[in-house]
Amino acid sequence: MTKLFIPYIMGNKDLIENATLLSENGADIIEIGVPFSDPVADGPVIMEAGQQAIKQGITIDYIFNQLEKHGDQIKCNYVLMTYYNIICHYGEQAFFEKCRDTGVYGLIIPDLPYELSQRLKQQFSHYGVKIISLVAMTTDDKRIKDIVSHAEGFIYTVTMNATTGQNGAFHPELKRKIESIKAIANVPVVAGFGIRTPQHVADIKEVADGIVIGSEIVKRFKSNTREEIIRYLQSIQQTLNN
């Protein structure tokens, strides 16, 4: 099975241009961050990118508008990474309806309690927008079974107990945990948080069905040339599927 490559970008003025570049260079699914004033799950790089986007006037409406107009330029699935507060403020039903209308494949909602995710799935499944389950390394086995049994799209295993994009030191129990999740899962199990280099990818791909790279991609879009970004994406893609 081909391993999934899921890069993250912040929703900003360059959203469509950046997402198109990623989709043309090996991305299977793109995670689009919705800027939020209190992003509890984000590391410093993504937090700063979010603050910049807010200063640019980026809102969820702007992101929906761009996806509605130009989403067909993105040649792969895309998901929104957003906080529940934004969904609640927008109105749950209106939010899911808009996701469907703008081609959003799924939602990653890091502050969403499991019980609330179940209600949203039951209430809004007819919109066809998947709610992606997150599993932390600290989650106990019983809760993992509950989460996995209702998972859709893919399962996002959080490979560090720290916030995103830190030193890339993987939890010692990580591989065992991912293997135990895969044994009972009916959807791909991907690893994210702290993956930056081809070496990290080579290490984690032994067990995971794919990887998410966030902070490193955001950093490179800020400081690298288009050619440098493409070279980096190719190095990740080659390592992932070698």
Curated annotation (Swiss-Prot):
Pathway: Amino-acid biosynthesis; L-tryptophan biosynthesis; L-tryptophan from chorismate: step 5/5. Pfam families: Trp_syntA. One of its GO terms (molecular function) is tryptophan synthase activity. The keyword Amino-acid biosynthesis applies. It is an enzyme of class 4 (lyase). Gene3D superfamilies: Aldolase class I. The active site is at residues 31, 42. InterPro entries: Aldolase_TIM, RibuloseP-bd_barrel, Trp_synthase_alpha_AS, Trp_synthase_suA. Its EC number is 4.2.1.20. The keyword Lyase applies. GO terms for cellular component: cytosol. It comes from the Bacteria. It catalyses: (1S,2R)-1-C-(indol-3-yl)glycerol 3-phosphate + L-serine = D-glyceraldehyde 3-phosphate + L-tryptophan + H2O. Keywords: Amino-acid biosynthesis, Aromatic amino acid biosynthesis, Lyase, Tryptophan biosynthesis. Tetramer of two alpha and two beta chains. The alpha subunit is responsible for the aldol cleavage of indoleglycerol phosphate to indole and glyceraldehyde 3-phosphate. Belongs to the TrpA family. This is Tryptophan synthase alpha chain.
